[in-house]
């Protein structure tokens, strides 16, 4: 069963990718969806068997590296952390596969798309189930490559190619530091197996542990899109919407957080790394929320929302509340996937337009999409008794419950980030569904026309009928679009994820963060006793600070709605003022981080590369190579040719020098010494060269005199 969890998505990917022409579009969709759905069922069984019964399972397939001083197996382990991570990864992957059947139905490359999706799922399973850092790195690189392939799936679009390359190169920075961290672990302990490394972690020097932790943190920063290495995340929205839901909800972006949780026995012994995680997550939360508030692309707003929630998870890791971070990761995966798929349903209905300023009034035409996006947004802003409420508010309470300067400061910063999260969630819902219609009129005529046709077919049962000539002409002139809600395959994942977004947090909160829970008794998550704050969080935090995020959420939601409905001119006038214009431009351009990177890092590296190419490749190497050799040989040939001056005395001198050299060489060989011979030879050679050069100068002067005389005679 456990091996099937790993292998089935790979088999589906191979069949769809290599035999897509044989099985056809429907066959590729059926095989990949069935393989992932069966894998999901097996993973749920593993969750109950391993998680509730505390029976970790290890599978060793074969030896991968076998040397005298280092052995590593191609092995997998299923502990409580692994099976908990598999739940969101596989459930959302299977729902995205189902959703893509309808969403990508008009695309001519269905087999390739489904092959990439299944391969991505397989690589994520490898990353999560690996029992050593090296095998985990295989999955880590695999999801990076699959992300590149999926973001650039529409490879004829320049923006998609640029975005995929940006994601790939940005993640290489984190991968470089992760590799350095693995080398330091290997140099320190001589092994990369989790069991060996974590059992020896208490005996590692604290400075070495800090270096390892910082390298792992930078690797997680790139993959989980923290401040500094976050620029790839909004650009990755150029891929198809199901890809955004899969990559940026449950899989690739959570890989960095998973790495930190898996390495908890290492980073628990470095307070520096924990403090860095705490502040990095806080800055990321407020930074991304503020940027998301000023974006106009519906998918980019949700992407920055993802970045903000990842910052909350990193805050929980900095507080050593790894179980809370895992709980929030799982909860976030469900409602964020629902937001992305709901956004995809909206985009699908308005002819692929993503600017929500051109939406408005879609509530009546997309009632299911509006309902599920409202549920997901309520869960995102931690509305009471929604899934996100049980984890997000607990992270804020944990920050205050640490009762330190950093903890209270991070609580304040994260609460401000939660306020901005509320504002952009209200903004997306209001401008998309509730505001006055702002889109092109033919979209709404399209909706109304197809609603009438739907009602006619429903009541008469006729599927074939003739339309009036003017209606037929109107339909033919409309752009390609899907009116109203999508079909069964588009709606089913939305309903399932909506149920998860409402009930999952309440059902599982005692399993993951309950004080009496023994779910993590197998030590897959390690919390040092001096860092334990669960009791203080539950019982010592004042009620006011527990309710403060909720109060701010409700207050600012009402303020945003009142300003939009009652005082829209106030917002417009502020935006058109000099201060508002500058503020909007600064935040809309993402704090000008990309400008800074391009100007001071990218251009500097490109200039440095150009100079190195110019000096080394085209300079030193060519000078020492064929170009330089040619110049030296030409110079030597000219020097030798200059010895021929056609003057008899020079030839006599050469003969004399050669004769003397011959005599002294013979004498020196007889006497066993060569010093006098060398000195005399050098002296004579210098005399010869000076004489020949003077003679050549005299010869040139004579030639010039002869030429000038001839010219005078000609005149």
Swiss-Prot record:
- Which residue ranges does UniProt annotate as crossing the membrane? 1-21, 30-50, 81-101, 119-139, 140-160, 177-197, 200-220, 241-261, 274-294, 310-330, 331-351, 366-386, 403-423, 487-507, 543-563, 647-667, 668-688
Annotated GO CC locations: mitochondrial inner membrane; respiratory chain complex I
Give the E.C. number(s). 7.1.1.2
Keyword set, alphabetical order? Electron transport, Membrane, Mitochondrion, Mitochondrion inner membrane, NAD, Respiratory chain, Translocase, Transmembrane, Transmembrane helix, Transport, Ubiquinone
Its annotated compartments are:
Mitochondrion inner membrane
- Please give, as recorded in its UniProt entry, the membrane topology of this protein: Multi-pass membrane protein
One Pfam family from the record: Proton_antipo_M
| Catalyzed reactions per annotation | a ubiquinone + NADH + 5 H(+)(in) = a ubiquinol + NAD(+) + 4 H(+)(out)
Kindly list the GO molecular function terms attached to this UniProt entry: NADH dehydrogenase (ubiquinone) activity
User: Is Endoplasmic reticulum among the key words of this record?
Assistant: no
The answer to whether keyword ATP-binding applies is no
One Gene Ontology term from the biological process aspect of the record: ATP synthesis coupled electron transport
> What does this protein's UniProt record list under function?
Core subunit of the mitochondrial membrane respiratory chain NADH dehydrogenase (Complex I) that is believed to belong to the minimal assembly required for catalysis. Complex I functions in the transfer of electrons from NADH to the respiratory chain. The immediate electron acceptor for the enzyme is believed to be ubiquinone.
Q: Which NCBIfam families match?
A: NDH_I_L, PRK06590.1
Family (UniProt): Belongs to the complex I subunit 5 family.
- Its name, as the record gives it, is NADH-ubiquinone oxidoreductase chain 5
């Amino acid at each position: 069963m456990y091996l099937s969890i790993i292998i089935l998505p790979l088999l589906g990917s191979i069949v769809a990718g290599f035999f897509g022409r044989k099985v056809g579009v429907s066959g590729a969709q059926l095989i990949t969806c069935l393989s992932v759905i069966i894998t999901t069922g097996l993973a749920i069984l593993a969750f109950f068997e391993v998680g509730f019964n505390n029976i970790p399972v290890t599978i060793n397939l074969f030896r991968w590296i076998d040397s005298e001083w280092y052995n590593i197996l191609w092995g997998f382990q299923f502990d409580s952390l692994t099976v908990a991570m598999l739940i969101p990864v596989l459930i959302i992957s299977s729902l995205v596969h189902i959703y893509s059947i309808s969403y990508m139905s008009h695309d001519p490359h269905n087999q390739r798309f489904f092959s990439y999706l299944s391969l991505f799922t397989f690589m994520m399973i490898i990353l999560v189930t690996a029992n050593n850092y090296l095998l985990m790195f295989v999955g880590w690189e695999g999801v990076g490559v699959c992300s590149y392939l999926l973001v650039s799936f529409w490879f004829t679009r320049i923006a998609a190619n640029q975005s995929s390359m940006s994601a790939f190169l940005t993640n290489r920075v984190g991968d470089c530091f992760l590799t350095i961290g693995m080398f330091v672990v290997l140099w320190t302990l001589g092994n990369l197996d989790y069991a060996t490394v974590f059992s020896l972690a208490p005996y590692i020097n604290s400075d070495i542990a800090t270096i390892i932790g910082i390298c792992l943190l930078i690797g997680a920063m790139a993959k989980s899109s923290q401040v500094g290495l976050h620029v790839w995340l909004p650009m990755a929205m150029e891929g198809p919407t199901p890809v955004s839901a899969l990559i940026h909800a449950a899989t690739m972006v959570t890989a960095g957080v998973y790495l930190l949780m898996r390495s908890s026995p290492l980073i628990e012994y470095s307070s520096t790394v924990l403090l860095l995680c705490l502040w990095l997550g806080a800055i990321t939360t407020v930074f991304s929320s503020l940027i998301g508030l000023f974006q106009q692309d519906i998918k980019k707003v949700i992407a920055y929302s993802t970045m903000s929630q990842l910052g909350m998870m990193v805050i929980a890791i900095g507080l050593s509340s790894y179980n809370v971070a895992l709980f929030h990761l799982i909860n976030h995966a469900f409602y964020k996937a629902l937001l992305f798929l709901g956004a995809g349903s909206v985009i699908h209905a308005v002819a692929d337009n993503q600017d929500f300023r051109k939406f408005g009034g879609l509530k009546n035409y997309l009632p299911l999409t509006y309902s599920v996006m409202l549920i997901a947004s309520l869960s995102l802003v931690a509305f009471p008794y929604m899934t996100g409420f049980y984890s997000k508010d607990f992270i804020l309470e944990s920050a205050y419950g640490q009762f330190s300067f950093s903890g209270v400061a991070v609580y304040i910063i994260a609460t401000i980030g939660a306020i901005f999260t509320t504002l952009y969630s209200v903004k997306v819902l209001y401008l998309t569904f509730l505001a006055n219609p702002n889109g092109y009129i033919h979209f709404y005529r399209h909706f109304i026309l197809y609603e009438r046709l739907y009602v006619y077919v429903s009541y008469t049962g006729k599927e074939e009928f003739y339309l009036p000539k003017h209606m037929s002409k109107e339909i033919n002139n409309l752009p390609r679009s899907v009116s109203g809600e999508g079909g069964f395959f588009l709606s089913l994942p939305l309903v399932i994820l909506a149920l998860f977004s409402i009930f999952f947090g309440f059902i599982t909160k005692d399993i993951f963060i309950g004080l009496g829970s023994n779910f993590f008794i197998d030590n897959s998550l390690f919390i040092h006793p001096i860092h334990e704050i669960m009791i203080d969080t539950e019982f010592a935090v004042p009620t006011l600070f527990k309710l403060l995020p909720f109060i701010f959420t409700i207050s600012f939601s009402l303020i945003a709605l009142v300003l939009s409905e009652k005082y829209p001119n106030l917002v417009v006038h502020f935006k058109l003022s000099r201060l508002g214009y500058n503020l909007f431009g600064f935040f809309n351009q993402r704090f000008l981080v990309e400008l800074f990177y391009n100007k001071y890092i990218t251009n500097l590296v490109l200039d440095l590369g150009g100079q190195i190419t110019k000096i080394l490749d085209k300079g030193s190497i060519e000078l020492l190579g064929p170009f330089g050799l040619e110049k030296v040989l030409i110079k030597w040939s000219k020097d030798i040719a200059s010895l021929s001056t056609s003057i008899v005395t020079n030839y006599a001198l050469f003969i004399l020098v050669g004769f003397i050299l011959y005599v002294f060489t013979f004498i020196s060989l007889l006497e066993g010494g060569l010093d006098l011979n060398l000195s005399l030879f050098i002296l004579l050679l210098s005399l010869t060269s000076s004489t020949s050069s003077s003679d050549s100068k005299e010869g040139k002067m004579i030639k010039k005199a002869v030429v000038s005389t001839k010219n005078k005679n000609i005149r």
